[in-house]
């Protein structure tokens, strides 16, 4: 019997085994069939044909039928295992991008095993409350996640016809956002910041306070059912990672947070898959577990620089500032994985954070990001230098979906008009401030002085607030009206007469 089974294996057929119907050997035939069939028809081929190492790339020769995006396992001479992905195929040559970096790879002694599969990540609802590295491996000393499914990290394409237009406003508790750049559930809106500005504190405050608008002032309910946060850090320092982790733990939301951390001392190339792992997890939580997921991606500038490094190693023709010409497309594959889908209650709201090099908003990274996303929140260095927190400059900030998320039935009927009037007065106030620097205060008219007074009070009372101050959208609008009462009714030209007669005469508090 054993000889016949062995002969079957040699001839390429499954071994014929007796089929026990009960006892510990039940199912042994199925197991033998599965094991033998897998490796006889599709063997995993191992190669020791590394012909060169260039930056994060490994070039292999004499590879049989390599496939684009196939996952490769590399075993180094000391037994260390690394994984990579086929980036380019040319005949029997394959270019493999190694996620953990190529340091220590010996061209003669490194063996490469082609798996025949694409990069999939294990996903489960148990990932909430856990901390992973940039490759998706647990680093919180907890057990390996028991996967409910293995999903392609590039995500599933969503039929545009099945997308739902975002219409539910998320109340962040920050007046500069809620009052003038309202965020809808399912929107993608980045924070444009720069080195040394408190963008992490703003993102943490949004995470703490985000929830749906409560229809009544009387009900104070900050709980949010089915709410989850997926946080992905790329190239951040340990201080930033620790800040977010401790903030989530202190406000008791760590059980609803999944963290992916690629630190500054981790391989650069790993940053290319970190946001995709995070978004794949978010899609599982949103569309299969039907949770409302907020995805924070920081820092997208580190991601773009990793992309430039791979492009340079492949000797591709560079675009603006050395970034690859396909960076727009590549960023879109990340940002477009936000939104809502018909037939599913879950949603994905994305808030990517990017630091503008040299505070330059025309740099390719913020420039291309602004084309793809639905607005931006602009963090301003001048406001920060004047000790205003959050230093959000509302003039270059924008939310393209604000119009559909506010108004009667969603926030309040005067919301859009108040926002427009505040924008207009603040813009004129900025012009008056610039004119005052040239001609002096004595040359200003009485109207100009009103705009100057509004400018100062707007920045001190409306924009400025505490890091733990959670204002409702109604409180934000009331503060806006207090500021607008600085002007006589006739100067408020952006607000209809009916709205003015209802809200303007209200007894004003101190402002």
From Swiss-Prot:
Gene Ontology cellular-component annotations: apical plasma membrane; clathrin-coated vesicle membrane; cytosol; melanosome; plasma membrane; synaptic vesicle membrane; vacuolar proton-transporting V-type ATPase, V1 domain
Topology versus the membrane: Peripheral membrane protein
UniProt protein name: V-type proton ATPase subunit B, brain isoform
Residues given in the record as ATP binding sites: 400
Keyword annotations from UniProtKB, A to Z: ATP-binding, Cell membrane, Cytoplasm, Cytoplasmic vesicle, Hydrogen ion transport, Ion transport, Membrane, Nucleotide-binding, Synapse, Transport
Xref: Pfam families: ATP-synt_ab, ATP-synt_ab_N, ATP-synt_VA_C
Organism placement in taxonomy: Eukaryota, Metazoa, Chordata, Craniata, Vertebrata
This protein's record includes keyword Transport: yes
InterPro entries linked to this entry: ATP-synt_VA_C, ATPase_a/bsu_AS, ATPase_F1/V1/A1_a/bsu_N, ATPase_F1/V1/A1_a/bsu_nucl-bd, ATPase_V1-cplx_bsu, P-loop_NTPase, V-ATPase_su_B/beta
Major site of localization recorded for this protein: membrane
Top-rank lineage group of the source organism: Eukaryota
Transport found in the keyword field: yes
UniProt cross-references to CDD domains, sorted A to Z: ATP-synt_V_A-type_beta_C, ATP-synt_V_A-type_beta_N, V_A-ATPase_B
A GO term, aspect molecular function: proton-transporting ATPase activity, rotational mechanism
Subcellular location: Apical cell membrane; Melanosome; Cytoplasm; Cytoplasmic vesicle, Clathrin-coated vesicle membrane
PROSITE patterns with a match to the protein in the record: ATPASE_ALPHA_BETA (PS00152)
């Amino acid at each position: 019997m054993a000889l016949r089974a062995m002969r079957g294996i040699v001839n390429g057929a499954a071994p014929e085994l007796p089929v026990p119907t009960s006892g510990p050997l039940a199912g042994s035939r199925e197991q033998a069939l599965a094991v033998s069939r897998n490796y006889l028809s599709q063997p995993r081929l191992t190669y020791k044909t590394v012909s060169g190492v260039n930056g994060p790339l490994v070039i292999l020769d004499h590879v049989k039928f390599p496939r684009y995006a196939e996952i490769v396992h590399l075993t180094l001479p000391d037994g260390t295992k690394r994984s990579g992905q086929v980036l380019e195929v040319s005949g029997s040559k394959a270019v493999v991008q190694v996620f953990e970096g190529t340091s220590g790879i010996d061209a003669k002694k490194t063996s490469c095993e082609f798996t025949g599969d694409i990069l999939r990540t294990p996903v489960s609802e148990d990932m909430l409350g856990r901390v992973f590295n940039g490759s998706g491996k647990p680093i919180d000393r907890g057990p390996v996640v028991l996967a409910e499914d293995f999903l392609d990290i590039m995500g599933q394409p969503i039929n545009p016809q099945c997308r739902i237009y975002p219409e539910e406003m998320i109340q962040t508790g920050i007046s500069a956002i809620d009052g003038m750049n309202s965020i809808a559930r399912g929107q993608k809106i980045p924070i444009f910041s720069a080195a040394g500005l408190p963008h992490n504190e703003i993102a943490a405050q949004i995470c703490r306070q985000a929830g749906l608008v409560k229809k009544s002032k009387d009900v104070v309910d900050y709980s949010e059912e089915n709410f989850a946060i997926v946080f992905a850090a790329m190239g951040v320092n340990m201080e930033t990672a620790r800040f977010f982790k401790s903030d989530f733990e202190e406000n008791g939301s760590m059980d609803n947070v999944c963290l992916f951390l690629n630190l500054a001392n981790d391989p650069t190339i790993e940053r290319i898959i970190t946001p995709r792992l995070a978004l794949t997890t978010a899609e599982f939580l949103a569309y299969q577990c039907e949770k409302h997921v907020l995805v924070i991606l920081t820092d997208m500038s580190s991601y773009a620089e990793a992309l430039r490094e791979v492009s340079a190693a492949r000797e591709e023709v560079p675009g603006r500032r050395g970034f690859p010409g396909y960076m727009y497309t590549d960023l879109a594959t990340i940002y477009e994985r936000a939104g809502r889908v018909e037939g599913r209650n879950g949603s994905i709201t994305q808030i990517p954070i990017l630091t503008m090099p040299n505070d330059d908003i025309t740099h390719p990274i913020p420039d291309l990001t602004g084309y793809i996303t639905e607005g931006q929140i602009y963090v301003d260095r001048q406001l920060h230098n004047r000790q205003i927190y959050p230093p959000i400059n509302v003039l270059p900030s924008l939310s393209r979906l604000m119009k559909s998320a506010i108004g009667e039935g969603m926030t309040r009927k005067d919301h859009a008009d108040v926002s427009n009037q505040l924008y207009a007065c603040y813009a004129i106030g900025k012009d008056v401030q610039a004119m005052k620097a040239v001609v002096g205060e004595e040359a200003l008219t009485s109207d100009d002085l009103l705009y100057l007074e509004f400018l100062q009070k707007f920045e001190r009372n409306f924009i400025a607030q505490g890091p733990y101050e959670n204002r409702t959208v109604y409180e934000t609008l009331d503060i806006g009206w207090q500021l607008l009462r600085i002007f006589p009714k006739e100067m408020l030209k952006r607000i209809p007469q009916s709205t003015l007669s209802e809200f303007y005469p209200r007894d004003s508090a101190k402002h």
